[in-house]
């Protein structure tokens, strides 16, 4: 059995930054550190940080006065931000800068009195945070997930309308929704640059290349990870058997027993140690040395807040 690795895969710059913010805060201030929502959607990462003293909460009311609070990489609404400001809390923001970019687009539209349409998945924390940037009662903020949603949507003023997207969507599906928006609302204005982030796009391109060669595709990522789910869906659309797994223990030998080639990738919130464990598991099932495919190089780095820029090893 041949083992192929997608390239790129795994951690993106926003996830690296968010995890570093929690780790550095723990090193500087000590436990407990409170984090609103899972800092990134990966069970291994969250469990590791929890063991070190991070407490993950959903409501600001759960945080005691005087505590350290961190917003997750997915971002928060203005209402949540204002609630935190009203409390005696030290707040650090781990929102991915590429999510913040979308927040700023929504806020600008709100100030201008433009109505805004967000393409995204209902209930996802990034969507809730982005929708929560709009505050103009004269306008409106709407969520669509599919072309069908677009055709049934009614807005107040089609002449003052803009759209944005969640950063972790399927590139292909989003293109279909944007096409529908432009047909339904010819005057609608979109962002100058696609809101779907570089890491999402690159990992989807990489899994497409992987699926062209592999019989079975394993996507390392948690069930609540939007970008990981999109990778598995893309491989399935290409006619491949694909499984979304949290770790190597999830793999069943029957999945790969007849496969000549197994492809492995990882969502943007999955650490590489999980991929290495998957490779070891596949080798137990008769796999050979893992080969990494050629792919797009990523060298983007997002800095942590200056108050947290320390060498954790020195603090520890």
Swiss-Prot record:
Cofactors that this protein relies on: [4Fe-4S] cluster
Residues involved in isopentenyl diphosphate binding: 41, 74, 124, 225-227, 269
Pathway annotation from the record: Isoprenoid biosynthesis; dimethylallyl diphosphate biosynthesis; dimethylallyl diphosphate from (2E)-4-hydroxy-3-methylbutenyl diphosphate: step 1/1; Isoprenoid biosynthesis; isopentenyl diphosphate biosynthesis via DXP pathway; isopentenyl diphosphate from 1-deoxy-D-xylulose 5-phosphate: step 6/6
Keywords: 4Fe-4S, Iron, Iron-sulfur, Isoprene biosynthesis, Metal-binding, Oxidoreductase
Active site positions, chain numbering: 126 (proton donor)
Keyword Iron: yes
Binding site for (2E)-4-hydroxy-3-methylbut-2-enyl diphosphate: 41, 74, 124, 167, 225-227, 269
Binding annotation for dimethylallyl diphosphate: 41, 74, 124, 225-227, 269
Biological process, per Gene Ontology: dimethylallyl diphosphate biosynthetic process; isopentenyl diphosphate biosynthetic process, methylerythritol 4-phosphate pathway; terpenoid biosynthetic process
Function according to Swiss-Prot or TrEMBL: Catalyzes the conversion of 1-hydroxy-2-methyl-2-(E)-butenyl 4-diphosphate (HMBPP) into a mixture of isopentenyl diphosphate (IPP) and dimethylallyl diphosphate (DMAPP). Acts in the terminal step of the DOXP/MEP pathway for isoprenoid precursor biosynthesis.
Entry protein name: 4-hydroxy-3-methylbut-2-enyl diphosphate reductase
Source organism of the structure: Salmonella heidelberg (strain SL476)
Name of the gene encoding the protein in the UniProt record: ispH
């Amino acid at each position: 059995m041949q083992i192929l690795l997608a390239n790129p895969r795994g951690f993106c710059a926003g996830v690296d930054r968010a995890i570093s913010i929690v780790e550095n805060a723990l090193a500087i201030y000590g436990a407990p550190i409170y984090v609103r929502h899972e800092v990134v959607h990966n069970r291994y990462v969250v469990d590791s940080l929890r063991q070190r003293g991070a407490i993950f909460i959903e409501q600001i009311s759960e945080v005691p006065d005087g505590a350290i609070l961190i917003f997750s990489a997915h971002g928060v609404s203005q209402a949540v931000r204002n609630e935190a400001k009203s409390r005696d809390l030290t707040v650090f923001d781990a929102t991915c800068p590429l999510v913040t970019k979308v927040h700023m687009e929504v806020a600008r539209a709100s100030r201008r009195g433009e109505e805004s349409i967000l393409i995204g998945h209902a209930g996802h924390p990034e969507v809730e945070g982005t929708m929560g940037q709009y505050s103009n009662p004269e306008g409106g903020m709407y969520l669509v997930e599919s072309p069908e949603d677009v055709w049934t949507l009614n807005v107040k003023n089609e002449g003052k309308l803009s759209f944005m997207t969640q950063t972790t969507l399927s590139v292909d599906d989003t293109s279909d929704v944007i096409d529908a928006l432009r047909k339904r609302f010819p005057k609608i204005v979109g962002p100058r640059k696609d809101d779907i982030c570089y890491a999402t796009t690159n990992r989807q391109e990489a899994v497409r290349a992987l699926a062209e060669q592999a019989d079975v595709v394993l996507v390392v990522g948690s069930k609540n990870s939007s970008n990981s789910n999109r990778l598995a869906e893309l491989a399935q659309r290409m006619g491949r058997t694909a499984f979304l797994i949290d770790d190597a223990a999830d793999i069943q030998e029957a999945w790969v027993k007849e496969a000549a080639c197994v492809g492995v990738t990882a969502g943007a919130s999955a650490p590489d140690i999980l991929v290495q464990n998957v490779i070891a598991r596949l080798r137990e099932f008769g796999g050979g040395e893992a080969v990494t495919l050629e792919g797009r190089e990523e060298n983007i780095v997002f800095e942590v807040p200056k108050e947290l820029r320390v060498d954790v090893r020195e603090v520890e």
